Structures are given as C-alpha cells and as structure tokens.
Amino acid sequence: MANSITHNTATVSASLNEDSLTESRLPTINDYLELCKIKVVALLVLTALVGLALAPDMGRGYFVQLLSLFGIGLLSSSAAVINHIVDSKIDAKMVRTKNRPLVRKAVSRRQALIFSAVIGTLGFSLLVFAANWLTAQMTLFALVGYAFVYTMFLKRATPQNIVIGGLAGAMPPLLGWISETGQLAAQPWILVMIIFTWTPPHFWALAIHRKADYAKAKIPMLPVTHGTDFTKTCILLYSLLLTVVCFLPFLIHMSGYLYLFVAMLINIIFIYKAVALKLSETSYGALNLFKYSILHLTLLFIALFADKFLM
C-alpha cells in the first residue's frame, strides 16, 4: 500500500510541472464545477440533509444548518478534485472520462490542487464554526478515505475497491446528523448502511458497461478480474441485501408508511432490473441499471425527508 501511495504521490508532484501554455489561460467556472463533480456532490449533500433532518432538533436555526451542509459539500468537492488530479492519466485512456478538464488541459494540475486546497479549507472552517469539531473531523476523515485511500490505493489494488472504499462515500447522512447533534448515534449508521450497500451494484453496473475501458486502464474492477457473469450475480445478491437494509429505517421507527411504500416500490424495480441483467446474454441492461440506481437512491432519501415532515 505504501509503495502504491508513494508512486501516485510522486506522479501528482511530477505532474505539477506543466507547460506554461496550460496556465496561460484561466479556467472557466464550468471547468471548476466539472472538477467538483457537482451532480455527485448534490446527491451526497441531499443524503446529508436527510441525516440532519432526522436528527433531534437542537434549535440551531436554518442558516447555520445551511452553512453546515455547504461545508460538507465543499469538502466533498475538494475530494472530487483530488480524484481528478490523481486519475488524470487513467481518465485519458477511458472514453467516459477523456474529456475531463485536466485531460483536455482546460485546468492544470497546479490550478486544480490550489482550488482543492482552497475549497477544502473553507469547507473545514465552515464545519468548525457552523457545526462542531466532530463533524469537521469526520468529514475530513471521509475526504482522506475517498481521495487518498480509495483513489490512490484501493482503486488500483483490488476488485473489492468499491466495497471497501464505499464507506467514505456513504458517510454524509452521519455527517449531517452529527452536524446537528454533535454526537454519534446508532440511527444515522442505518442510513450509512443503505448507501454502503447501494454502492457496489451501482458501480459494478457501470463497470460492466465500461469493462473495456477499465481493462485498458488496468483498473481491476470486478468484471475485468472475475468476468461479467459473476459480476451480474453479485449485483443481484447486493440488490437483495439492499432491499433488506432499506427496510431498517421503518423497522426501527425512523420513518413511517410513506417511506415504506416508496422503498418497497423502488427496490422491487431494482431487483427486477438486476434479475433482467443477470438473465440477459448481453450487457445492454447494465447502463440502464446504473442510471436507475441513481434515481433509486435519490427517491429513497427524498421519501425519508418527506416522511419526516408530511406524515
């Protein structure tokens, strides 16, 4: 692990010495927004909002709560930028990522690194002053887990990269909860478990669709190392496990019947799509399942939020 991280750190450091042509033009706002993976971060912030909303009301006020969510979003964006920096050479080899800002030299690595440091520092500071030290520390822990442990090591080291590294991306509901209460509790870990269980089938579906890309980039995603059919089986098994985990908020009285109805409906569809993918002799359904999984998680957390305030 140490050798892998050292190699990637050296690669990033060496890459900072880019030609002056790249830095002679200023990146656009859209370039920086693309580095932040805004759509991904928006979903993370949504899950953090739900964690905050389900926490006991500590009377902190909406503005302070908004600042806390903004801080979580900024640190998540900072991690996304680091991911772009570390993965730029891999991104250049893959169809899905070959037009990212660092690959097309719209942003230099130095500019990206400075940007990541600035928004990361701002996000951490917001969490310290608007939330509490525990939230700031836990969010920083999640950033390190995703940007360094997962991106620099796990992603390149094992086909279980998504399973192990998925914990960092599953943390926002817990972060939202502790930003309100300042304490760890059992309930938000249920929400973490949902995202943690959702992550493997979500990314494995994409990995099936982009199997050739990952193989070309020498990333040991499960379809590359164990084959497409085995990965389809794993997706199906995880979809069943996800369904069970999604019922936990209702079973422990974190939610009511509105959430239960939505969870049942969207998980039945998830399982149906996973079964269809497994039985298919092709991989055409993989992209469809990947896209649906994003809608699934979005609707699930919206249902949790709505159940809290409408029922």
From Swiss-Prot:
Catalysed reactions, semicolon-separated: heme b + (2E,6E)-farnesyl diphosphate + H2O = Fe(II)-heme o + diphosphate
Keyword set, alphabetical order: Cell inner membrane, Cell membrane, Heme biosynthesis, Membrane, Transferase, Transmembrane, Transmembrane helix
Compartments where found: Cell inner membrane
Job of this protein: Converts heme B (protoheme IX) to heme O by substitution of the vinyl group on carbon 2 of heme B porphyrin ring with a hydroxyethyl farnesyl side group.
Gene Ontology cellular-component annotations: plasma membrane
Pathway: Porphyrin-containing compound metabolism; heme O biosynthesis; heme O from protoheme: step 1/1
Family, per entry: Belongs to the UbiA prenyltransferase family. Protoheme IX farnesyltransferase subfamily.
GO biological process: heme O biosynthetic process
Native source species: Psychromonas ingrahamii (strain DSM 17664 / CCUG 51855 / 37)
Protein's name in the database: Protoheme IX farnesyltransferase
Gene that this polypeptide is encoded by: cyoE
One term of GO molecular function: protoheme IX farnesyltransferase activity
